[in-house]
UniProtKB/Swiss-Prot annotation:
InterPro entries per UniProt: Atg3/Atg10
Record has Membrane as a keyword: no
Organism: Phaeosphaeria nodorum (strain SN15 / ATCC MYA-4574 / FGSC 10173) (Glume blotch fungus)
Pfam family, one: Autophagy_act_C
Compositionally biased tracts (Basic and acidic residues): 126-135
Name of the protein: Autophagy-related protein 3
UniProt free text on domains: The N-terminal region is involved in phosphatidylethanolamine-binding and is required for ATG8-PE conjugation.
Function: E2 conjugating enzyme required for the cytoplasm to vacuole transport (Cvt) and autophagy. Required for selective autophagic degradation of the nucleus (nucleophagy) as well as for mitophagy which contributes to regulate mitochondrial quantity and quality by eliminating the mitochondria to a basal level to fulfill cellular energy requirements and preventing excess ROS production. Responsible for the E2-like covalent binding of phosphatidylethanolamine to the C-terminal Gly of ATG8.
PANTHER family assigned: UBIQUITIN-LIKE-CONJUGATING ENZYME ATG3
Residue ranges of the region described as Disordered: 126-153
GO biological process, alphabetically ordered: autophagosome assembly; autophagy of mitochondrion; glycophagy; nucleophagy; piecemeal microautophagy of the nucleus; protein targeting to membrane; protein transport
Length: 350
C-alpha cells in the first residue's frame, strides 16, 4: 500500500513536469502526441457515439496541452456480468495463456502475444484459429476445416445454433455491475491511460477492493492501482491501468497488424480467398479496414462505392493497417485483456 502511494505521488509529479512533444513517433515508438490523441479521440467519438469528450471540473484541473472541452474521453454504463474468480472460466479460469497471432515463426515470442485468462489447460498451445464445437453433453468435436464454416445468414432458423443453458449447472453470472471508462493522455509516457469507475446493481459506487475483483490477477496492485481521477475537484477513486508498458505493446500490435495486412495483400495478389476473420491480427485488420471503407464510401453509391473496395484491396506495399486516428480502437482492444469481464465491445462494435 505504501509503495502504491509513493508511486502515485511520483506519477503525479512526472505528469505535471513532463516535457510535451509535438513530433509524431507513432510508427516508430507506439507513442502519440497530444494532437494525435485529440485526433484519435475525435475518431472514436465519431465512429462510436457512446464515447464523448469531457472537460475538467475547473480551470485549475485542466492541462494546457489539450483543448478546453477535450481533456479526456468517457463512456458510461459499460456492463460487467461476471467476476474474475474461479467460476469465470471454469477450472481453466486459473490458467493464463499467451495467445499468438498466428504468424509463422512467432513461437516462443510470448512477450509479444495477447494475455488470455482461462479457457485452456496449461499444457495446450494457444492457437487463435483452432476452433472446435462442443455438443450438449460437453464432448469436444473435431476441428472444422475453413470451408466447412457455415454462413451465419443460413443459421437464423437452425435450432442447433442455439446456445442452451446446461440443466442443473451453476451459473457464473454475478450481480450486474456497470463501469464508467475514462481515457486520459499521459504526458510522461505519451500514451493514453485508462481509468475505471465501477457501480453496483443499485448504482452505488464500488469500493476499491470490489473494483479489483474485475481485474486480471497478475495486474492487481502492480499494473492496476487505485488512483484519484485527475480532472475532478472531488476525489473519485478509480482503478487505473498504469501506462508504463502501453507504448511498447502498442508498437508490437501495430507492427503485427501491418504484417497481417501485407499477408492479406499477398493472398489477394495470388488469387486466394481471404474471407472475413474474427480473431487474431488479421481479424483486427478486417475491423480497421471496414472503418476505412465506411469513411470513404459514406455518401457514395453504386460504382463509386465499389471503387473504394478496389482501392482497399489493391493498396501498395507501404500501406499501413492502422492509422494514427484509429489508435484508440486498438488501445481499447488491448485494455480488454486486463478487464475481460467488462464488456468493452459494448461501447464500440465495429
Amino acid at each position: 500500500m505504501a509503495y502504491n502511494f509513493v508511486r502515485s505521488y511520483i506519477d503525479t509529479f512526472r505528469e505535471r513536469t513532463a516535457a510535451i512533444s509535438h513530433t509524431s513517433t507513432f510508427r516508430e515508438t507506439g507513442q502519440i502526441t497530444p494532437e494525435e490523441f485529440v485526433l484519435a479521440g475525435d475518431f472514436l467519438v465519431f465512429k462510436f457515439p457512446s464515447w464523448q469528450w469531457g472537460d475538467a471540473s475547473s480551470a485549475g484541473k485542466r492541462v494546457p496541452y489539450l483543448p478546453e472541452g477535450k481533456q479526456y474521453l468517457m463512456t458510461r454504463g459499460v456492463p460487467c456480468h461476471r467476476r474474475l474468480d474461479d467460476n469465470f472460466a471454469g477450472e481453466a479460469g486459473q490458467d493464463e495463456t499467451i495467445v499468438g497471432d498466428g504468424f509463422a515463426g512467432s513461437e516462443g515470442a510470448d512477450d509479444d502475444g495477447w494475455l488470455r485468462t482461462g479457457g485452456m489447460a496449461a499444457s495446450q498451445e494457444a492457437k487463435v484459429r483452432d476452433v472446435r464445437t462442443v455438443d450438449e453433453s460437453g464432448n469436444l468435436g473435431a476441428a472444422e476445416e475453413e470451408d466447412e464454416i457455415p454462413d451465419m445468414e443460413d443459421m437464423d432458423d437452425d435450432e442447433e445454433a442455439i446456445i442452451r443453458d446446461p440443466q442443473g449447472g451453476s451459473s457464473s453470472t454475478a450481480p450486474l455491475r456497470t463501469y464508467t471508462l475514462y481515457i486520459c493522455y499521459s504526458a510522461h509516457y505519451r500514451t493514453p491511460r485508462l481509468y475505471l469507475s465501477g457501480y453496483g446493481a443499485t448504482s452505488v459506487p464500488l469500493k476499491p477492493q470490489e473494483m479489483m475483483e474485475d481485474i486480471v490477477g497478475d495486474y492487481k496492485d502492480k499494473t492496476v492501482t487505485i488512483e484519484d481521477f485527475p480532472f475532478f475537484e472531488h476525489a473519485l477513486k478509480t482503478a487505473s491501468v498504469h501506462p508504463c508498458k502501453h507504448a511498447s505493446v502498442m508498437k508490437v500490435l501495430l507492427d503485427r497488424a501491418d504484417a497481417a495486412l501485407k499477408l492479406r495483400l499477398a493472398k489477394l495478389k495470388a488469387g486466394k480467398d481471404i474471407g472475413k476473420l474474427d480473431t487474431g491480427m488479421e481479424g483486427l485488420v478486417d475491423d480497421t479496414r471496414l472503418l476505412k471503407l465506411s469513411e470513404q464510401a459514406k455518401g457514395k453509391e453504386g460504382d463509386e462505392a465499389k471503387d473504394d473496395w478496389e482501392v482497399l484491396s489493391e493498396g501498395g506495399d507501404d500501406e499501413v493497417a492502422i492509422r494514427v486516428d484509429q489508435y484508440l480502437v486498438v488501445f481499447l482492444k488491448f485494455m480488454a485483456s486486463v478487464t475481460p469481464g467488462i464488456e468493452h465491445d459494448f461501447t464500440m462494435g465495429v
